[in-house]
């Protein structure tokens, strides 16, 4: 029988614990034990069940002060374990979905099945206080033996996601270390699970906000992150459909979406540009989105034709050549009080496409809310055509209407790695600490000829989001993320 208690005292190879029933017990000490820690143990771990256990109770009762101290430690740990004692969350998705609550030593504090298959999977298992890598490995092997992973299924995919506990009051540097450690933990889990025959593992690092939103919709955080990725591609999957889809089906659907985008023919001009400075009506590559719950509506699939001048000729500046707006000389980060940003980006388009995809997501890594009217983001590239011959479109902005996002092209003279950049600014929006915002957009030449992006400074030909320092972010004209090109 698995039991829980708080360590009151450590004596050599023994530890004194106070159980939730108010009983003091002496148990075998483990190497990782420390005073005040909540631990799980079995009856066979208890020393002299019929003797010393009750003697220790009698001794403890004689010291009221000691009892009060221990009770304080116990209730502090019991009631605050959901905040300071919890380091993060690891979710295993196959079709059974199970969330594991872990402490800073990567021990499992709690096991939370997230669907009926998950309840069946963990039934009868003793998983508390075990290393999370061992637990994940055990769950996946059990999924195979239970038939959740079919022997004849060529798509044996396991999704493992992780998120930190945002309730932990820590310095920014410690938070960044935690993020790096979480990534390393997911990599270690993946490396171990990859040893299981024919199992393919995909890992996702989620934000605490994404995890909370996932819980609202009754999804695991990993599945919800796949849903968000689908929304950015074309929005053809709904929340209700996600509930009924397996992880393998979802990932296969995402791959089909990506291939469809790559296979799309280059957009054709509907009319030719006129001489009076008027801009032609064109059909850019479709990037449709259905409504994300809690977010503003995005263009429907019926909107086949988009005018590049949708936002007031944003891509046609007033002057023929513009200098960068208040550039910063430093290529290092400038800390602006407790404000910080991080950009994650990858291109969904091939290097020789007719449009450059600058869609990204941006995190508030600081301790203060950020007014996005003070923020600028830059995407750097090389191109011989004039900035007057390019235009842009924003299809989705998670913190408001796409019309609240403005873009402008700038020449970047004297640089080897880039000669132009697109600057993205915001008319509205507030990004709270630990929150994330999404932008979907692209820019293109007015004649819709193809770009060659392989030598573009900001181009990232990856297949999923990653921290991307070749896009820069500024708060009040101070560089807070990324490295400017040389």
From Swiss-Prot:
Q: Does the keyword Cell cycle apply?
A: no
Q: Which domain of life is it from?
A: Bacteria
Cysteine pairs forming cystine bridges in this chain are none
GO cellular component term of the entry, any: plasma membrane
One GO biological-process annotation of the entry reads: carbohydrate metabolic process
Specify residue ranges for compositional bias: Polar residues.
Answer: 268-291, 322-333
Q: How does it sit in the membrane?
A: Single-pass membrane protein
Q: Where is this region: Disordered?
A: 265-336
Q: Where in the cell is it found?
A: Cell membrane
Binding residues annotated for Ca(2+), in chain numbering = 382, 452, 455-456
What does the UniProt keyword field contain? Calcium, Cell membrane, Coiled coil, Membrane, Metal-binding, Transmembrane, Transmembrane helix
Extracellular-side positions: 75-486
> For the RsgI N-terminal anti-sigma domain, which residue ranges apply?
3-50
Residue ranges in the Cytoplasmic topological domain are 1-53
* GO MF annotation terms: cellulose binding; metal ion binding
User: Tell me, how does this one assemble?
Assistant: Interacts (via RsgI N-terminal anti-sigma domain) with SigI1.
Note what the entry says on domains.
The CBM3 domain binds to cellulose.
The name of this protein is Anti-sigma-I factor RsgI1
Q: Which gene encodes it?
A: rsgI1
